[in-house]
Amino acid sequence: MINFNELIKVGNFNKSHGIKGEISFVFTNNFFFKGKNSFLICEMEGIFIPFRVESYRSISNSTVLVKLKNINTIEQTKLLTYQEVFLPKKQSAENTKLNYFSWDHYIGFNIIDEKNREIGSITDIDKSTINTLFIVEKESKEILIPTANEMIVTIDEKRKIIYMKLPVGLL
């Protein structure tokens, strides 16, 4: 039996997609997307149930369409709609060892642009939109910067710096 204390929340299922059992999954950290996960866990009627991932495809920085094994109809996906999704903490720890961190890991890091200018310090992460955003404080102002992988040049874990190529007009 799966115990809640052994799990970490990684996101929520959202709505059904199509008629063949796909469901959108919004993940709140990148353990799922970057790791090698063969199943996701949901609580159903007080019991944690693993669902084998048959396939998935990315539709944004924080959303994938997931096809679960033996979930083949809209009716079946509706049972999972808006359910919290978990992974075993052990699996998350393995992903972390491979440098697959939650975006929250980067709170406190500084952002430096391609011209070597300090943009500011990450104070929070906004996961309320399709695109996850760094909330960066600079001179008492809040700047929202997308966490898009194509904008991240490199990450210096030791110095807590994220080097980014920012689009013109963002600042």
Swiss-Prot record:
Family to which the UniProt record says this protein belongs: Belongs to the RimM family.
GO cellular component entries: cytoplasm; ribosome
Pfam short name (any one): PRC_RimM
Chain ranges of the PRC barrel domain: 97-170
Gene3D superfamilies the record matches: PRC-barrel domain (2.30.30.240), RimM (2.40.30.60)
Keywords for the protein's UniProt record, in alphabetical order: Chaperone, Cytoplasm, Ribosome biogenesis, rRNA processing
InterPro entries, sorted: PRC_barrel-like_sf, PRC_RimM, RimM, RimM_N, RimM_N_sf, Transl_B-barrel_sf
Entry keyword annotation includes rRNA processing: yes
Binding partners and assembly: Binds ribosomal protein uS19.
Domain remark text: The PRC barrel domain binds ribosomal protein uS19.
GO biological process: ribosomal small subunit biogenesis; rRNA processing
Coiled coil: none
Protein name: Ribosome maturation factor RimM
Biological role stated in the UniProt entry: An accessory protein needed during the final step in the assembly of 30S ribosomal subunit, possibly for assembly of the head region. Essential for efficient processing of 16S rRNA. May be needed both before and after RbfA during the maturation of 16S rRNA. It has affinity for free ribosomal 30S subunits but not for 70S ribosomes.
SUPFAM superfamilies xrefs: PRC-barrel domain, Translation proteins
Cell compartment(s), UniProt: Cytoplasm
Any one GO molecular function term: ribosome binding
